[in-house]
């Protein structure tokens, strides 16, 4: 099933289409009258994380070594939680940092417990580096539900979800087709972009009990939902996950955040053949003359629909994607060729840079043709420019590996003339990073691991962090402040509570600020603020590479900027499903331990501690404890 994660946009958008508007206090179904607040259905935080330092205190386990990394990981699960029923998730891989990432799903009577996962990270030495665990340990159901089948049928579940969430789906006359023992597809519905499905699974509830549910998947465009309907009571929805978080090329060159930072240039063959060996205009089987290739397909989508294959996209003679554009041009459709080209360019550069940093085929990146390098193909990113389904936002939908991602870039009406999100690179990088974080956290096959309020906030924070790191200029120092979304929003304050700054007087956010925040974009601002501190600590130590790509020495970026981007990315793959800030911090420390043998431990600790996530910081969803302490060796 989809592990889609709705990548939130720059701001808080309705529901989970992640986008950029003004911060709001709730997340509701996009565009729905009387919309349901999805925050009420978020999955509760249940994960634990055993860091590398904690593993060293458990020599009998940490030193366990036998066979392949899969065998080591499997044995660890058996030793840690004996007599549990589980299965290996088929998305394990060894990342480019040498860490073997293995994930397991708990089962009961052969039925998945959909939010019970165990991830094991095996180091290059064959020993367990760290692990995360959210396995259910409460009482097991006394009987197999498949024997008596005393649960509602899937059609009742679909109707229940439709009614409970006010979804625009009609199912009168629809019928069910079996896909597997526990999964069905609904044929004959209308109102969804693809046929809805339902899968029978358990959900571990916040009160420690287990609920049998139908996981109903519905893609209605702005929201791509996994709704967990109680299998005994068709009016009770336990949880909801939203997957949407929302030649020559004349473009604003990579590194320019928006049109205020520079002029457009004509670039020849801007792809990197090490990361896009088929170029951006081929999938290995077909060569294209339009904005389509192995990594992405970009088009004009004025009606906001899903028929992207037949939508207009520029297809110039001689592959010269050179079109006029000025922010003063109006209406926006007069420069649609330039808009689609810019969106295609920025997204492809994201693909290439993230590939260099470790987001490759095995890790679940977005490509049609994986060229035998692992992972699942047929999943480029669908890029919709000037998407007509909304305004003042952008969003990204991240299904599991093997299914295309989808980005929608909207027109912003806060200025006159309106502004096109395709031309604010920070917006597009933020959205693309939702695809990165949702595929890495939980593994390529599970896009449901950034759904708790704090992990969802980190999803927003990572988007801002990568967009900000990319836009750093040669003369920037730790005193440089950056706002998010200032150009599209026509506001010097941007779309966040505070600028990103290392000055506590400019940005006072600390870990305990989260105690008063209940919206993912606001929480994400706290997380990115911490990462910005770590970024500058590493730059001050290692310098800053102002080029468009990292330079590696023995697999390690030789500057602070790209090193920060690398270990933050590695941390995403190491951390448990639905992590909290403390666990994600520890995963970054473990990523540095693996990559550099902990050479940057103190710089990382000091960055987090300055913002209250030091030694002694504790997570509690209602009463977080802050700490400015660092380990003794860092004082």
Curated annotation (Swiss-Prot):
Taxonomy, superkingdom: Eukaryota
Annotated compartments: Secreted
Gene3D superfamilies for the chain: 3.10.170.10, Neutral Protease Domain 2
Catalytic EC class: hydrolase
Residue ranges of the propeptide: 20-246
Cofactor names: Zn(2+)
Main location: secreted
GO CC term, one of those recorded: extracellular region
Active site: 431
CDD domains hit by this protein: M36
GO terms of biological process kind: proteolysis
UniProt-listed Pfam families: FTP, Peptidase_M36
Keywords of this entry: Glycoprotein, Hydrolase, Metal-binding, Metalloprotease, Protease, Secreted, Signal, Virulence, Zinc, Zymogen
Glycosylated position list: 287, 475, 594, 623
An example molecular function term from Gene Ontology annotations: zinc ion binding
Binding residues annotated for Zn(2+), in chain numbering: 430, 434
Cofactor annotation comment: Binds 1 zinc ion per subunit.
Job of this protein: Secreted metalloproteinase probably acting as a virulence factor.
UniProt family annotation: Belongs to the peptidase M36 family.
Name of the protein in its database record: Probable extracellular metalloproteinase 1
């Amino acid at each position: 099933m989809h592990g889609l994660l709705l990548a939130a946009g720059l701001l808080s958008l309705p529901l989970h289409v992640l986008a950029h508007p003004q911060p709001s206090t709730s997340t509701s179904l996009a565009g729905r009258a009387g919309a349901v607040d999805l925050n009420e259905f978020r999955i509760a935080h249940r994960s634990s994380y055993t860091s590398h330092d904690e593993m060293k205190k458990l020599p009998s386990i940490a030193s366990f070594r036998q066979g392949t990394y899969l065998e080591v990981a499997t044995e660890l699960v058996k030793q840690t939680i004996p007599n549990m029923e589980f299965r290996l998730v088929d998305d394990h891989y060894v990342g480019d940092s040498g860490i073997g990432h293995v994930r397991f799903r708990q089962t009961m009577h052969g039925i998945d417990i959909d939010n019970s996962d165990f991830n094991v990270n095996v180091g290059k030495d064959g020993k367990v580096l760290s692990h995360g665990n959210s396995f259910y340990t409460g009482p097991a159901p006394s009987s197999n539900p498949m024997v008596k089948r005393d649960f509602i049928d899937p059609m009742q579940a679909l109707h229940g979800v439709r009614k409970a969430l006010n979804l625009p789906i009609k199912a009168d006359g629809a019928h069910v087709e079996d896909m597997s023992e526990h999964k069905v597809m609904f044929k004959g519905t209308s109102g969804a972009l693809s046929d809805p499905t339902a899968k029978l699974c358990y959900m571990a509830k916040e009160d420690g009990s287990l609920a049998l549910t139908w996981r109903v998947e519905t893609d209605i465009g702005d929201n791509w939902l996994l709704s967990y309907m109680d299998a005994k009571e068709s009016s009770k929805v336990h949880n909801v996950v939203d997957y949407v978080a929302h030649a020559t090329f004349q473009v604003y060159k990579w590194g320019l955040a928006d049109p205020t930072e520079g002029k457009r240039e004509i670039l020849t063959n801007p792809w990197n053949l090490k990361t896009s060996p088929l170029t951006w205009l081929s999938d290995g089987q077909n060569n294209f003359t339009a904005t389509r290739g192995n990594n992405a397909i970009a088009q004009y989508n004025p009606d906001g629909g899903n028929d992207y294959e037949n939508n207009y996209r520029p297809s110039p003679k001689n592959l010269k994607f050179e079109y006029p554009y000025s922010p003063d041009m109006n209406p926006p459709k007069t420069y649609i060729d330039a808009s689609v080209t810019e969106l295609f360019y920025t997204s492809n550069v994201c693909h290439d840079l993230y590939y260099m940093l470790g987001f490759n085929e095995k890790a679940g990146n977005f490509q049609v043709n994986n060229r035998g390098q692992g992972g699942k193909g047929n999943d480029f990113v669908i890029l919709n420019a000037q998407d007509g389904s909304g305004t003042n936002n952008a969003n990204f939908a991240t299904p599991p590996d093997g299914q295309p991602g989808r980005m929608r870039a909207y027109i912003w009406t806060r200025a006159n003339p309106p502004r096109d999100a395709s031309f604010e690179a920070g917006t597009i990088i933020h959205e693309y990073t939702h695809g990165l974080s949702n595929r890495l956290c939980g593994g390529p096959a599970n896009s449901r691991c950034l759904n708790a309020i704090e992990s969802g906030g980190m999803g927003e924070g990572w988007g801002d962090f990568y967009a900000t790191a990319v836009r750093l200029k040669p003369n920037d120092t730790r005193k440089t402040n950056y706002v998010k979304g200032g150009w599209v929003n026509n506001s010097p304050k941007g779309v966040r509570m505070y600028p990103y700054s290392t000055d506590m007087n400019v940005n006072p956010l600390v870990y305990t600020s989260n105690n008063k925040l209940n919206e993912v974009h606001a929480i994400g601002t706290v997380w990115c603020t911490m990462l910005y501190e770590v970024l500058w600590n590493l730059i001050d130590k290692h310098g800053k590479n102002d080029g468009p790509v990292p330079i590696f020495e023995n697999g390690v970026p030789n500057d602070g900027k790209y090193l920060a981007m690398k270990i933050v990315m590695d941390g995403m793959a190491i951390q448990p499903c639905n992590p909290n800030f403390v666990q994600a911090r520890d995963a970054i420390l473990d990523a540095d331990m693996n990559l550099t043998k902990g050479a940057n431990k103190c710089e990382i600790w000091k960055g987090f501690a300055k913002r209250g996530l030091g030694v002694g910081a504790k997570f509690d969803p209602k009463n977080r404890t802050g700490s400015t302490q660092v380990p003794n060796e860092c004082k």
